[in-house]
Swiss-Prot record:
Entry function: Cell wall formation.
Organism: Azoarcus sp. (strain BH72)
Keywords: ATP-binding, Cell cycle, Cell division, Cell shape, Cell wall biogenesis/degradation, Cytoplasm, Ligase, Nucleotide-binding, Peptidoglycan synthesis
Gene: murC
Location relative to the cell: Cytoplasm
Protein's recorded name: UDP-N-acetylmuramate--L-alanine ligase
Reaction(s) this enzyme catalyzes, per UniProt: UDP-N-acetyl-alpha-D-muramate + L-alanine + ATP = UDP-N-acetyl-alpha-D-muramoyl-L-alanine + ADP + phosphate + H(+)
Family: Belongs to the MurCDEF family.
List of residues binding ATP: G112, T113, H114, G115, K116, T117, T118
One GO cellular component, as annotated: cytoplasm
Amino acid sequence: MKHKVKRIHFVGIGGAGMSGIAEVLVNLGYSVSGSDLGDSAATRRLKAMGAKVVLGHDAANVEAADALVVSTAVKNDNPEVIAARARHIPIVPRAQMLAELMRLKSGIAIAGTHGKTTTTSLVASILAEGAMDPTFVIGGRLNAAGANARLGKGDFLVAEADESDASFLMLSPVISVVTNIDADHMDTYGHDFARLKQAFVDFLQRLPFYGVAVLCEDDPHVRSIMPLVSKQVVRYGLSETANIRAENIRAEGGRMIFDVLRVNGSTTRLADVVLNLPGLHNVRNALAAIAVATEVQVPDEAIVKALAEFSGVGRRFQRYGEVAAPSGGTFTLIDDYGHHPVEMEATLAAARGAFPGRRLVLAFQPHRYTRTRDCFEDFVKVLSTVDALLLAEVYAAGEAPIVAADGRALSRALRVAGKVEPVFVEDIGGMPQAVLEAVRDGDVVITMGAGSIGAVPGKLASNEEQA
């Protein structure tokens, strides 16, 4: 019956999760079209590959479609959704389309509140180095591939599994990874943390009887669900009880070096493994990838080479290099997608480790009013650890403002805490200039957030604001 579906239309085709699936479908030979509110690198790439992409949503866009793919960000009052429903065109959730792709391959699904994109990228890179030619769909741009998706000829499909809308429960992988479990996207789970944890259990229970759950031993919430999982479990982490663990860890010039111990009856050691990423959190991400690679029998030489040569993921501790400071000298510019206090803390710790003794300047844009409200005190705590802070207004992501959960409220709370004096930047368009006014020679500047702040480092690096 699948041959009846020839043209697939994506509503919001430029989104991180949507564009990757669209790219794989283009490469599978489907006629792909899509609409989005704005032009982006993702939409331009898809156009170059032959997809028909239009700006703006209109009922006419779906006239020739056999199926409509939507993310949870697309509302029922979208004109394309209304038109598809009137024409009885199937409306397919993004995760369901990913699940269809996964049925064609052996799926490796990476879940967890933090670290999904980096871990998925590491797994894809290791499998590629091991000549397994994987298909991958990633929530960020894998620098080595120049894309966030690729159709491979091998047996495996590596993808992120999204818990934010519980859509990961549609996937049927053969290997599932859970990096950690934290309180985020709690609206989906009725603000009930027990329900969130149960969703992860249900996700792992979707594994077949021969499947493997790769779980982080260091995360207390992941550890707490292990007894509820009736599948083979491989534990990874820094803990001595992990099956795959790291020892002799040291930071060196923005990289991490460590030994890997694999305990499975006998013990094997990989000495002096080099990971071309900073931070203990990335050591854990690498251990998860090593665990997966070991399960699918990637040679150790390929694992070691892929980790040492890993060139990163777009907006995950992405280094823009040295930028001229207006007052003379230069500053180091880094961009990161972090938007939850836990991942922000890990990234800032990684920066301290990679650049010891240097002043750390953070330009941060909070993402969603609900997250700002739910994690308010944690944001105050983590933002108080930097040496200088430029704070933007909350990126709404479609949400209505919430009283006492906006940028000004966060700025006031930080002043009361007294550890850092924030500079509030109401319009994100003014952020590049605000950074240049605050920066000194030798500083490390990190732009951080999941919203429109992603455009700021490019402007700083190209000296647009200094012209």
